Amino acid sequence: MNAHKERLESNLLELLQEALAGLNDGELNSLSVTKVECSKGKHHALVFVLSSDHKILSKLKKAEGLIRQFVLQASGWFKCPKLSFVLDNSLEKQLRLDAIFNEIAKGKDND
């Protein structure tokens, strides 16, 4: 991955956190953005948020215009990527893997 893309994704992640924190919706302003993946040319960004509620995605879709407007004003960029929000389930996967490894470790201790 090139340095420019990494820097862009990092900046966008910070700006999105600030944008969400500034919204008047209690559910949205407490969300955590865990990861941002930008396409080439900064036309599209996949935004991973930490939540177990699928209803959050529709709220984020409705607030996308406000979020993009904040990003443009705060960054000074000429354009803001189209944002697609996705629930981040990597924490759940990690917890399941940890549980599996703990079971394996217990099995070895019993041998």
From Swiss-Prot:
One of its GO terms (biological process) is maturation of SSU-rRNA. Keywords: Cytoplasm, Ribosome biogenesis. Pfam families: RBFA. InterPro entries: KH_dom-like_a/b (IPR015946), RbfA (IPR000238), RbfA_dom_sf (IPR023799), Ribosome-bd_factorA_CS (IPR020053). It is found in: Cytoplasm. SUPFAM superfamilies: Ribosome-binding factor A, RbfA. GO terms for cellular component: cytoplasm. One of several proteins that assist in the late maturation steps of the functional core of the 30S ribosomal subunit. Associates with free 30S ribosomal subunits (but not with 30S subunits that are part of 70S ribosomes or polysomes). Required for efficient processing of 16S rRNA. May interact with the 5'-terminal helix region of 16S rRNA. Monomer. Binds 30S ribosomal subunits, but not 50S ribosomal subunits or 70S ribosomes. Belongs to the RbfA family. This is Ribosome-binding factor A. The gene is rbfA.
